[in-house]
Amino acid sequence: MEDLIKHQYSVGVLCRNIGIYMGLSSKEIELLETAAFFHDIGKLFVPKSLLNKKEPLSIEEFELVKMHSLYGAELLKKIGFDSTVVSAIRHHHERYDGRGYPDGLRGEKIPLFSRIIAAADAYDVMTTGRIYKKPLPHDKAIEELIRYSGTQFDPEVVKIFLKMFKEEKAYV
């Protein structure tokens, strides 16, 4: 649980910085940061045994883990969060090439906040590691963002991300 909170906080800070760099309004930055802080809240409804599993997940197990974006979006919708936040959470695992989930959205059809969260989320996961994977150094994580720009990640978001790090304004 503590790791989830740290992760959501780090992703929130990164997203806030990206939003500032992109020139988003203060209201948009607030909504983006809120979505980022809650992007993985749906994992509370996924068995811990799956989230903490060291071995590769079976197809069925992965399908259960993938549900976290839907669970999170539904929860926040029910308690009255802004629809922009709900949508960002639902779609934060969509891929720029359309091969993500839950809806297989592609390119600009993916909400901007989801595209920003996807890059920040991946960077944080890569640099902090997981129970099943060792952390990468900053430079290697950046290489991975570049490598998957245009397939997994929005190329424009990656460009902003790189510029931001180059100017050393994003470290959390």
What do the PLM-derived regions correspond to, one by one?
Residues 1-172:
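Histidine- and acidic-residue-rich, metal-dependent catalytic cores
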